[in-house]
Amino acid sequence: TPIAYFSLSNDNLSYEKFQQKTSFNRLNRAIDNAKRMKQYPAVKIGRLAIDESHRNTGVGRYLLSLIKSSMIINQKSGCRFITVDAYNDAIGFYEKNGFVMVNAFNPEKRTQPMFFDLAQLL
């Protein structure tokens, strides 16, 4: 029986996704001027699920670490960021693992867009 799974797809982190354009500009300043763009390649975590009997055991943290390492070592996707539309009750988990909210929390939405900058690991 599987204890966890995840799915990935190509995505982007773009200027349009940020309600506060100053947040995108702050992110942009961390990137070399010659390489700045209006959108950046990303890999989206479409699903990340852990069997209830294995929650709070480090399996989720391990899978995120595996995903992050894979993006840096393999470089098959050519991405700079990992994105996720986190369920509201999972935001804390992603924040503990270095993800940042794209916009301010919106209680009317079931999910919140978040991202992780892979440059932190280099």
Task: Annotate each PLM feature.
Residues 46-56:
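A short, internal acetyl-CoA/4′-phosphopantetheine-binding micro-motif in the GNAT/acyltransferase core
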Residues 3-4, 103:
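A structural microfeature
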Residues 64, 71-86:
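Conserved GNAT acetyl-CoA-binding A-motif
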Residues 83, 95-116:
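Conserved catalytic-core motifs of GNAT/GCN5-like acyltransferases
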Residues 56-70:
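Conserved acetyl-CoA-binding loop-helix of GNAT-fold acetyltransferases
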Residues 60, 64, 88-90, 104-114:
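Short glycine/proline-centered loop/turn elements that form peptide/ligand docking sites
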Residues 5-47:
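Conserved acyl-donor/pantetheine-binding loop and adjacent beta-alpha core of acyl/acetyltransferases
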Residues 1, 7, 29-34, 55, ...:
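An acidic/histidine-cluster motif and surrounding catalytic segment
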